[in-house]
A protein has these predicted regions:
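Bacterial N-terminal signal peptides that target proteins for export
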Residues: 3-31
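C-terminal motif of bacterial Sec signal peptides marking the signal peptidase cleavage site
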Residues: 38-41
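Noncatalytic scaffold domains of N-terminal-nucleophile
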Residues: 69-118, 122, 130-294, 299-301, ...
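Internal maturation/activation junctions in enzymes
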Residues: 86-87, 371-495, 624
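Short, small/polar residue-rich loop motifs at catalytic or cofactor-binding pockets
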Residues: 333, 474-477, 541-543
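Extended C-terminal subregions enriched in glycine
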Residues: 395, 415, 536-539, 577-627
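Bacterial signal peptide processing site
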Residues: 43-46
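Active-site rim segments in enzyme catalytic domains, especially the processed small/beta chain
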Residues: 143-150, 154-160, 166-167, 319-322, ...
Length: 658
């Protein structure tokens, strides 16, 4: 594999570097080991952030686990918008924080927050499995990333070892009593944002805890109660509010409306708590002690369930969630959605998650796209700031493939328990004959807006309408990537929906607003929308955990977690096609199209790219595309297998391991 120099933000964008691991040995020999890293050119083997390491090499902890600080991504987060496309607002970016990159020959976890990574590493050191570490980390993320995920939300988890690849669906479900008109007024008009995203109305049945319990029963090693200890300790002792969390608290227009949330996130005089303030959560610690002793049942059928239902029903914007809804919830094992691309096998989540299928479609299109193959290694160039970006032609082809995949997503993707797959099989959307048909739509000029395709023997193309909410931004989310001592891996993504979810707080954690993940408009010109709201249904989800294998083997090559398919697809392309390390690929500018305007990450791309796309007919928008990617990549050093870990420089994530 040939790795290219890692992109660096321009000096005006470079901010504080996350501290590296404990006294570390440097992997200066990576270049000589055949990774071909151009260390001097861009400062490091592990992309932006390797600048604080000698010769840019990754740091490996000399002790059993890395001790990482709580330094967050520098720069204030932007104020969340007061209105939302599709009822949902994008999670704001929070600047750029160079990440040093981490590596380990044994075990490692990369998490969206350093304290969560520490918790996971503690469990790995104690002999825990990848699933054990993911559970411990998620319990801490509920505490340290309350804007992005928690026990009150939903999650997706992929697991792989040398024998099996498994998918676990912990997405929320709609309360039984809701109707498809939940977000419409009496005249059929859409309700405003305050009635859509805040309060009890948008709350679905949380699924994260049941999913974690299901995965632990299958692949846990340590006792369930042991996994709760790091989060309980942190909730009791407190943790300093990160700059990112502080900025999001200060900017949220709805959070202070709930008395419990107001008491937790704001001072007595009403001022939002600031960065560095010690935040203790005794209510959450008590909840965790109850769950550690009793499993998930108290959450779904006991005292916690009663309090959740009461909170939702008695809020100023009441919802329909009941104790019975909670008691009926089931996390589901599913079959991963896998496909081959060149020398890799890419596996993601199946519907109602959309990321696995979108990536399979995009890379299936790349595989048969002559213009993509002709580009060879000429898909990246350096911009004036010294960073890497795609060439206009590469960005054009990537965006058009995404446009086609998202057209099908808007037409077909929904809860498979309620909505049939085209011709009864989701694989029809990646069949060679179907992709060959779709390839004919990609030309020298952008499609602008692509129409959904018609798989063979499918009548659904005329049965369902197009989802007007399909361009809603992806949810706020937290991600994990874990490898344990046995080589088993976990990729996980979890979310509350919007930042801070419904803004309702109960028992020390926030509840989701997952019902905004459905289409608010149930019909399109009289035709039902596949992702319309219905009681007991799971919303379509953009959460995208992904695992890549060396083709034809059980050998894991790459583990990724992301909130949306497009940044994950960019990262996969960076590794599989463009010769980058996972850190370099994550740090590339975010770009692509979800079948709307072609979006480019503002401040990270050149005028040459913008104009090149416009000449190809693209409507280009420069937007502050945040992402929350985490990744693990297997490489070889002196004949030894080594894991490289990295977190998105746009967020405060970190890695820890031994």
């Amino acid at each position: 594999m040939t790795d290219r120099p890692s992109p660096r933000p321009s000096p005006s964008r470079r901010q504080a570097t996350l501290p590296a691991a404990n006294p570390a040995r440097r992997l200066a020999s990576l270049a000589a080991a055949g990774l071909g890293l151009a260390l001097a050119a861009c400062g490091g083997a592990n992309g932006p952030g390797a600048g604080n390491a000698a010769a840019g090499a990754a740091a490996v902890s000399a002790s059993s686990s890395a001790t990482l600080g709580t330094t967050a991504a520098s720069g204030a987060a932007q104020r969340p918008p007061q209105t939302a496309f599709g009822g949902r607002v994008a999670e704001p970016a929070s600047g750029w924080s160079d990440k040093p990159g981490w590596s380990s020959a044994r075990s490692m976890i990369v998490a969206a927050n350093p304290l969560a990574a520490q918790a996971g590493a503690e469990i790995l050191k104690a002999g825990g499995s990848a699933v054990d570490a993911a559970i411990a980390a998620q319990l801490v993320l509920t505490l340290t990333e309350p804007q992005s995920s928690g026990l009150g939300g939903g999650a997706l988890l992929l697991y792989a070892d040398d024998k099996t690849t498994e998918a676990y669906d912990g997405l929320e479900t709609a309360p039984a009593a809701v109707s498809e008109r939940l977000f419409l007024d009496r005249d059929g008009k859409l309700l405003g944002p305050a009635q859509t995203v805040a309060g009890g109305r948008p709350v679905g049945v949380p699924g994260t805890l049941r999913m974690l319990e299901l995965a632990h029963r299958a692949h846990g090693k340590l006792p369930w109660k042991r996994l709760f200890q790091p989060a309980i300790k942190l909730a009791d002792q407190g943790f300093p509010i990160s700059p990112r969390l502080a900025a999001l608290i200060a900017g949220d227009p709805y959070l202070r409306a709930d008395p419990a949330a107001r008491a937790y996130f704001y001072e007595q005089d009403g001022r939002p708590k600031t960065a560095g303030t010690l935040l203790r959560n005794p209510a959450y610690a008590a909840t965790l002690r109850q769950l550690a002793a009793g499993g998930a049942n108290p959450f779904y059928s006991g005292a916690i369930a009663r309090e959740i239902a009461a909170k939702v029903g008695q809020s100023a914007n009441p919802g329909l969630l009941t104790q019975q809804d909670l008691g009926r919830y089931r996390a589901l094992p599913r079959t991963p959605f896998c496909g081959d691309y060149r020398k890799w096998t890419l596996c993601g989540m199946p519907p109602p998650a959309s990321g696995g299928l979108a990536i399979a479609q995009m890379f299936g299109l790349f595989d048969g796209l002559p213009d993509w193959q002709k580009l060879g290694g000429q898909k990246l160039v350096r911009n004036d700031g010294g960073g890497l970006e795609p060439t206009p032609q590469a960005a054009h082809l990537f965006s058009e493939a995404g446009r086609l995949a998202y057209a099908d997503r808007a037409r077909y993707l929904a809860d498979p328990e309620r909505v049939p797959a085209p011709a009864g099989d989701w694989q029809r959307l990646v069949a060679p004959t179907y992709l060959a048909q779709r390839l004919q739509r990609i030309g020298d000029t952008s499609l602008g807006h692509a129409e959904a395709g018609v798989p063979a023997d499918s009548t659904l193309a005329t049965s369902f309408g197009d989802d007007p909410d399909a361009l809603a931004p992806p949810p706020a989310a937290s991600e994990l990537a874990v490898v344990d001592h046995d080589g088993a891996v976990v990729a996980m993504a979890s979310s509350l929906g919007d930042p801070f979810g419904s803004r309702l707080m109960v028992r020390g954690f926030l509840l989701n607003d997952a019902l905004t993940g459905f289409s608010r408009t149930p019909r399109d010109h009289g035709r039902p929308i596949a992702n319309r709201l219905d009681g007991g249904k799971r919303p379509r989800s953009s959460l995208t955990p992904e695992i890549a294998f060396e083709r034809g083997t059980r050998r894991v090559a790459l583990v990724l977690g992301g909130a949306d398919a497009m940044p994950v697809a960019k990262t996969l392309a960076g590794v599989t096609d463009w010769g980058l390390t996972v850190a370099q690929a994550i740090a590339l500018p975010n770009f692509g199209s979800r079948n709307g305007p072609t979006e480019l990450e503002a401040g990270r791309v050149s005028d040459t790219l913008v104009e090149g796309l416009r000449r190809r007919g693209h409507e280009v928008r420069l937007v502050p595309i945040t992402s929350d990617l985490v990744g693990l990549q297997r490489v070889a050093l002196d004949g030894q297998s080594l894991w490289l870990g990295t977190a998105d420089p746009r967020r405060e994530g970190a890695a820890a391991g031994d």
